[in-house]
């Protein structure tokens, strides 16, 4: 059995990873060692039936004793520890949820239902750093993988509807707190059937603009609104989140020529599922039944939702998908621009295939 160290296992992504590993009995195949950046010496969790104490996540000697390190601690930790560990001569496997190492030449972005061939080649060539991808990119490829695998995609334009969980646990709390403030502000009026809805709306809008809602994390109110910008601003006018679409898609697929991917990334008031609306330029005219067949056959989690109003409203929403590994794709139809233009709408849990699940599955391969 390999010695596997876990850092950041108590955070949001780490907690989901632990839950999935327990469900899949992954701990049966490894010797886990749990680390902490702040609570060393305290009792370690009993995942996998082991007992012990939390180790120091900054102790290079303790880390060097591991065969595999899995970290969900974030980019600052990676940037501090990873170079020191490699410079010390450590040759173990590093599995990371943070974005810091994604675009490094000696790292592979992992999404095995989509790029197992790239992962296998990397392992055969001595690659030992494996990084989870951007959530929207991973979820797009899980849903639309059949089109990419069959070399049918000329380019992709996307508008995202990204959940609060993409920002982190504090962002989710802030969204719910904002919702509570708005409701409490008009609760009496809502309870009165004779109250005028426009009066209620005005009260809500006034409170939203008042500066009284908590916005420490988002910077502006999200409840009852949206934020059409995610991550840093780049010189070309893109947000960094939008830049990741093309950069990471092409690295994951190891394309020989760049597939253009661009669009707008928008934060909405969903809790943990990202949705995406796509305009896809195909390389040739492919019938909708064939498109549906290719998408459904690509991986066990891709689910084609018929382009029917009732089914779509029931199955192609964050409410339906949250907490599941299913990555449904629907609203598939040809657009007025021509027979090669395809629309699609996808939903996926940002904390599962968008974050924890690729890490879990990579660890399973290495263990």
From Swiss-Prot:
Transmembrane segments: none annotated. It comes from the Bacteria. The active site is at 135 (acyl-thioester intermediate), 274 (proton acceptor). It catalyses: L-aspartate 4-semialdehyde + phosphate + NADP(+) = 4-phospho-L-aspartate + NADPH + H(+). Coiled coil: none annotated. PROSITE patterns: ASD. Keywords: Amino-acid biosynthesis, Diaminopimelate biosynthesis, Lysine biosynthesis, Methionine biosynthesis, NADP, Oxidoreductase, Threonine biosynthesis. Phosphate binds at residues 102, 244. Gene3D superfamilies: Dihydrodipicolinate Reductase, domain 2 (3.30.360.10), NAD(P)-binding Rossmann-like Domain (3.40.50.720). It is an enzyme of class 1 (oxidoreductase). It holds the Pfam family Semialdhyde_dh. Substrate binds at residues 162, 241, 267. The modification S-cysteinyl cysteine is found at residue 135. InterPro entries: Asp-semialdehyde_DH_CS, Asp_ADH_gamma-type, Asp_semialdehyde_DH, NAD(P)-bd_dom_sf, Semialdehyde_DH_NAD-bd, Semialdhyde_DH_dimer_dom. One of its GO terms (biological process) is threonine biosynthetic process. Its EC number is 1.2.1.11. GO terms for molecular function: aspartate-semialdehyde dehydrogenase activity; NAD binding; NADP binding; protein dimerization activity. NADP(+) binds at residues 10-13, 37-38, 73, 165-166, 193, 350. Pathway: Amino-acid biosynthesis; L-lysine biosynthesis via DAP pathway; (S)-tetrahydrodipicolinate from L-aspartate: step 2/4; Amino-acid biosynthesis; L-methionine biosynthesis via de novo pathway; L-homoserine from L-aspartate: step 2/3; Amino-acid biosynthesis; L-threonine biosynthesis; L-threonine from L-aspartate: step 2/5. Catalyzes the NADPH-dependent formation of L-aspartate-semialdehyde (L-ASA) by the reductive dephosphorylation of L-aspartyl-4-phosphate. Belongs to the aspartate-semialdehyde dehydrogenase family. PANTHER family: ASPARTATE-SEMIALDEHYDE DEHYDROGENASE (PTHR46278:SF4), DEHYDROGENASE, PUTATIVE-RELATED (PTHR46278). HAMAP family: ASADH. Homodimer. This is Aspartate-semialdehyde dehydrogenase. It comes from Escherichia coli O6:H1 (strain CFT073 / ATCC 700928 / UPEC). The gene is asd.
